[in-house]
């Protein structure tokens, strides 16, 4: 039997099982994210939120998904049908694809590649094409304006996110996400994690993640008061559901990246307590809680404010931080965190 799993067919079946496992985890997380988002928002507004379908309203997301699937797909006149239907599918597939390099535990990763960080950013950069295609193919000015906003917004904040992660890569000496987690292992638990040496950049990374995923207060591409639903105005039923699923999966991915890069991934925060996948999921849930709270309490920015913050504040700060981290690593000024990799050695 062991010989069978070593064959090409056996390896293919293993990869298929891993892929299905990742999809199941992400989809279950998607349903819980939507439920949690609505519950947290309701609590802030002193409402109950979903509380009828299932215990504590847990099945409300399933009921809503079923409602969208069984609704009629209304296709407006004048749309480019192939591109119109391809756009939401592309958004969902790309959002799922980035998960193949995310480690959930030691050895629990589908593709443990040495350029995992680059892979995630490459796939995330492609997600904007689904939005642009949907806005352009809808043959309407509101979706098109929303898609243009999204393209400019995502490109602007990807630059800052990339520079912030360069600082983490310098500290670790690797672009492998599993190696980044292991580099944060130490005798002092959470004090060994990168949130401490990179503290100024954790907040910038989180805010950039909000803008990258079009979450409030940076949800300008789908601003209800201005563009109704932005690039999704002309979508209904299953295509609309695919767009929304892609957005929440991208948010879930950013929660995972934040946990891996700055909060030790699957590592236990308490010395002596075993590491494991539960710690990873708990950290992702904690990051999403902050996402949801920001959505509930922070008002939306104007578009000019959004772009000004990205280019005039975040970009210079993140670039300066890369220089600082490179200097500390090169000359081993502080040792410890910064002596992991000697640049040019």
Curated annotation (Swiss-Prot):
Which sequence ranges are listed under topological domain Lumenal? 1-15, 107-110, 177-191, 266-276, 334-345
> EC annotation?
7.1.1.-
Cytoplasmic side stretches: 36-86, 131-156, 212-245, 297-313
**Sequence intervals crossing the membrane:** 16-35, 87-106, 111-130, 157-176, 192-211, 246-265, 277-296, 314-333
User: Where does the record place it?
Assistant: Cellular chromatophore membrane
**What kind of membrane protein is this, topologically?**
Multi-pass membrane protein
Per its database record, what is this protein's job?
NDH-1 shuttles electrons from NADH, via FMN and iron-sulfur (Fe-S) centers, to quinones in the respiratory chain. The immediate electron acceptor for the enzyme in this species is believed to be ubiquinone. Couples the redox reaction to proton translocation (for every two electrons transferred, four hydrogen ions are translocated across the cytoplasmic membrane), and thus conserves the redox energy in a proton gradient. This subunit may bind ubiquinone.
Protein name, UniProt field: NADH-quinone oxidoreductase subunit H
